Amino acid sequence: MDLTKKWHRSEFVSHEMLEVHRGIECELDFYSAIANGEIELVQENCNEQAFTNPEGMGVLSTDALRNIRYHYVVTVALITRFCVHEGLEQEKAYNLSDFYILEMDKCKTIEQISKLHDVMCLDFCKHMHEIKNGQVLSKQVVLCLSLIHI
């Protein structure tokens, strides 16, 4: 069966099973809260364990552990880009991203990945909180500095 036929069959089955993904607004609001350094909001979301709630979560793998790993990597990548866009120095953001993905590789359970997810989100958020509340430099200056290789 070619991929187009497989895709159409998959789409039909999803439609018939009434499978619906979570609304993108909640996800974008969460990433924005991190990028804006809103620690309390991010902590609340982490406490709700929304990351591991299977309702509305896409299926990136039929293996539950692999599925959460893939979602984790996507989450880290998006948070990294949101934070860079809001003023986190690019190299620092990518180093944080790499660090947390490598740490996730060591996790053996969904629970370990979930805990690491919360730590990672709050770490990025705290970096952004410091930038937003103590930044003397404009976003444009931070961008220029990230382009200068010393």
Language-model regions: role of each:
Residues 1-128:
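Hydrophobic, helix-rich cores of sensory/ligand-binding and other regulatory modules
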Residues 137-142:
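Short, leucine-enriched amphipathic alpha-helices that occur as contiguous helical runs
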